[in-house]
Amino acid sequence: MALKRIQKELSDLQRDPPAHCSAGPVGDDLFHWQATIMGPPDSAYQGGVFFLTVHFPTDYPFKPPKIAFTTKIYHPNINSNGSICLDILRSQWSPALTVSKVLLSICSLLCDPNPDDPLVPDIAQIYKSDKEKYNRHAREWTQKYAM
């Protein structure tokens, strides 16, 4: 079941990739993918290339894939281990979702952080109190780690 679904998602992704994103298997292991998100235009991450790992559980799509950034990023919802605080990767997961939709959601999280559900409270506080300082730090990290 999982393998068929993953193969279908892969062919859909290759035929119609989501904006600013790409993904595919690492070697021959269809349960382990690498994904790429280009920093969205008009965001502090513009120009950056961010890599993520995608691990599918054997009971996919009934359980969500484990997705994490391998590129360091300054963001209130993404911690230093690359873990992403995004409801659809946890409690709001649905088998109707696809890797493509999840990558687009991560992209929009880069444009619109959720400081009220932070993984990194310090960054969330800066985002809320001094947006210019937040954007400056995010741009610096993008230039340092994602270019």
Curated annotation (Swiss-Prot):
Phenotype when changing residue 94 to E: Decrease in autoubiquitination
Pathway assignment: Protein modification; protein ubiquitination
A GO biological-process term: negative regulation of TORC1 signaling
Taxonomic superkingdom: Eukaryota
Gene3D superfamilies, sorted: Ubiquitin Conjugating Enzyme
Active site residues of this protein: 85
Enzyme Commission designation: 2.3.2.23, 2.3.2.24
Cell compartment(s), UniProt: Cytoplasm
UBC core domain location: 1-147
GO molecular-function term, one example from the UniProt record: ubiquitin-protein transferase activity
Record field: catalytic activity: S-ubiquitinyl-[E1 ubiquitin-activating enzyme]-L-cysteine + [E2 ubiquitin-conjugating enzyme]-L-cysteine = [E1 ubiquitin-activating enzyme]-L-cysteine + S-ubiquitinyl-[E2 ubiquitin-conjugating enzyme]-L-cysteine; S-ubiquitinyl-[E1 ubiquitin-activating enzyme]-L-cysteine + [acceptor protein]-L-lysine = [E1 ubiquitin-activating enzyme]-L-cysteine + N(6)-monoubiquitinyl-[acceptor protein]-L-lysine
Result for mutant: residue 98 to E: Decrease in autoubiquitination
SUPFAM superfamilies in alphabetical order: UBC-like
Tissue: Ubiquitous. Up-regulated in livers of iron-overloaded patients with hereditary hemochromatosis.
Complex formation: Component of a E3 ubiquitin ligase complex containing UBE2D1, SIAH1, CACYBP/SIP, SKP1, APC and TBL1X. Interacts with RNF11.
Protein name from the UniProt record: Ubiquitin-conjugating enzyme E2 D1
Encoding gene, per UniProt annotation: UBE2D1
